[in-house]
Amino acid sequence: MSVISMKQLLEAGVHFGHQTRRWNPKMKPFIFTERNGIYIIDLQKTVKLIDNAYNFVKDVAANDGVVLFVGTKKQAQTAIEEEAKRAGQYFVNHRWLGGTLTNWNTIQKRIKRLKDLKAMEEDGTFDRLPKKEVALLNKQKDKLEKFLGGIEDMPHTPDVLFVVDPRKEQIAIKEAQKLNIPVVAMVDTNSDPDQVDVIIPSNDDAIRAVRLITAKMADAVIEGRQGEDEEEASQEVAEGVSKDSLEDLKKSVEEGSNEE
């Protein structure tokens, strides 16, 4: 059973590619036909490849991996933030700052600054400062929040990137490649699939298409994490059982000795 049905993909407009004059020939294997000057994506392939992507992300999450959701184009911003939060993961939905991955130590310093400013606001420090200074600090805080708020609590560089539109997120993808971080991406007919490790051929411009697939990747994280939680719980039960068995064994040995 596929994680997304053909009907859902059709309703969300996942099959609509770009105009035929704006295409990347490497996407030819994923194109079904051309209609009114627009390429139509082969949804039979998309269904299978979404399953691949789902299982890949689920496995990463099951191993306590960190997933970074990336989509800075307007159509993706809301879905990227909401679905990453729902999955308990991290996101970049405004401009990707160069070095976010490759210069992680410097980025962490800027995140620390953001946390310090938030603490100053909460503990009443701002109330004791001149209004002009507070205005400047608030401006700085808002800017840092906009670009780094989604990765503020990310414990380390991610184990996988989920990207909406690799053409738009070139810098993020190049940084991931440098660090050997796998990339799962929604790839439209105008993108280069060779840049992506796990491809999802899809319309990456329609809000409904972006929401549908981003939500499914969030579901994969949640399912993977639930599997991990269940494994931990069963391990605890097993440890409890073996502990009880050991106690029972000791007890029976002691009782046997007493009888002698």
Swiss-Prot record:
Superkingdom of origin organism: Bacteria
GO terms, molecular function: structural constituent of ribosome
UniProt xrefs under SUPFAM superfamilies: Ribosomal protein S2
Region (Disordered): 223-260
CDD domains: RPS2
Keyword terms: Ribonucleoprotein, Ribosomal protein
GO biological process: translation
This protein's GO CC annotations: cytosolic small ribosomal subunit
The protein, known as: Small ribosomal subunit protein uS2
Gene name of this polypeptide: rpsB
